[in-house]
């Protein structure tokens, strides 16, 4: 396991995830009978500040179809949580117009790189081009100055 699991923190995430899914109308319990499902959900709603009990609620009452999706969501959230601790792993987002994204994605695919690697490569290419243009301009000015002095 790459990222440390923090039981209390993750139990809070699980509680929020389950409550959100319930409010969106998804069945979060394994019960078909409405009264049993409502009873289990009511119990869950009382467990917001009791992380140990949230995990036991999950073991007893969760809808099996929801369990894997919840695990994936928590795993992704754990990764984002730990990556956010360090500047170099913290993710940022930018808004692109669809056509720009499409061209960038195509270029990245042709180069066999990620979108981030492609953006870095394009920036480096532009910086090298700018540096080369400045060197040529300086060289041209130096040559003109040398030729102008000899006459």
Swiss-Prot record:
What is the recorded function of this protein according to its Swiss-Prot or TrEMBL entry? Required for spatial organization of the terminus region of the chromosome (Ter macrodomain) during the cell cycle. Prevents early segregation of duplicated Ter macrodomains during cell division. Binds specifically to matS, which is a 13 bp signature motif repeated within the Ter macrodomain.
GO CC annotations?
cytoplasm
Quaternary structure, per UniProt, is:
Homodimer.
Q: What is this protein called?
A: Macrodomain Ter protein
Matches recorded under Pfam families: MatP, MatP_C
Q: Tell me where on the tree of life, at the top rank, the source sits.
A: Bacteria
**What Gene Ontology biological process does one annotation of this record name?**
regulation of DNA-templated transcription
Q: Which HAMAP family match?
A: MatP
Major location (coarse): cytoplasm
Question: Is Lyase among this UniProt entry's keywords?
Answer: no
The protein's GO terms of the molecular function aspect are: sequence-specific DNA binding
Q: Which keywords accompany this UniProt record? A: Cell cycle, Cell division, Cytoplasm, DNA-binding
């Amino acid at each position: 396991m790459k990222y440390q699991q923090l039981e209390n923190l993750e139990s809070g995430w699980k509680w929020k995830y389950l409550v959100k899914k319930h409010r969106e109308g998804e069945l979060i319990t394994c019960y078909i009978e409405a009264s049993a499902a409502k009873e289990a959900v009511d119990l869950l709603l009382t467990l917001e500040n009791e992380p140990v009990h949230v995990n036991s609620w999950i073991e007893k009452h969760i809808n099996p179809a929801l369990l894997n999706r919840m695990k994936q969501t928590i795993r992704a959230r754990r990764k984002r949580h730990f990556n956010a601790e360090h500047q170099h792993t913290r993710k940022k987002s930018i808004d692109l117009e669809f056509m720009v994204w499409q061209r960038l994605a195509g270029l990245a695919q042709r180069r066999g790189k990620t979108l981030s690697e492609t953006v870095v490569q394009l920036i480096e290419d532009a910086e090298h081009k700018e540096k080369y243009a400045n060197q040529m301009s300086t060289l041209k000015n130096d040559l003109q100055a040398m030729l102008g002095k000899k006459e």
